[in-house]
């Protein structure tokens, strides 16, 4: 799958992550903090709450210069303890 994704993308390109995490106030700040370290910029995430309000879905778009940035951010965002899934 990684090879196919790498072949499909032309850099620089916009890439959107969808992150599912616990509905805690610090979730969005922690995600943006991780992204700012790799790719500084002004980010406006789209946030939706789950039906029961236990989880948040955060969609955030970056401008990646290479595939390694996409992979690195995927792994770094996954390390946030209140993140449950990164797509």
UniProtKB/Swiss-Prot annotation:
Record field: transmembrane: none
Top-level lineage group: Bacteria
Entry-linked Pfam families: DUF493
Coiled-coil boundaries: none
GO cellular component assignments: cytosol
Family: Belongs to the UPF0250 family.
The protein, known as: UPF0250 protein BU488
Species whose genome carries this gene: Buchnera aphidicola subsp. Acyrthosiphon pisum (strain APS)
Top-level taxonomy: Bacteria, Pseudomonadati, Pseudomonadota, Gammaproteobacteria, Enterobacterales
């Amino acid at each position: 799958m990684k090879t196919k994704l790498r072949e499909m993308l032309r850099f620089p390109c916009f890439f959107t992550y969808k992150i599912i995490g616990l509905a805690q106030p610090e979730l969005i700040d922690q995600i943006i903090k991780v992204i700012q370290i790799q790719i500084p910029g002004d980010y406006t995430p789209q946030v939706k709450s789950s039906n029961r309000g236990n989880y948040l879905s955060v969609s955030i778009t970056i401008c990646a210069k290479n595939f390694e940035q996409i992979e690195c951010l995927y792994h770094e965002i996954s390390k946030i303890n209140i993140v449950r899934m990164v797509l």
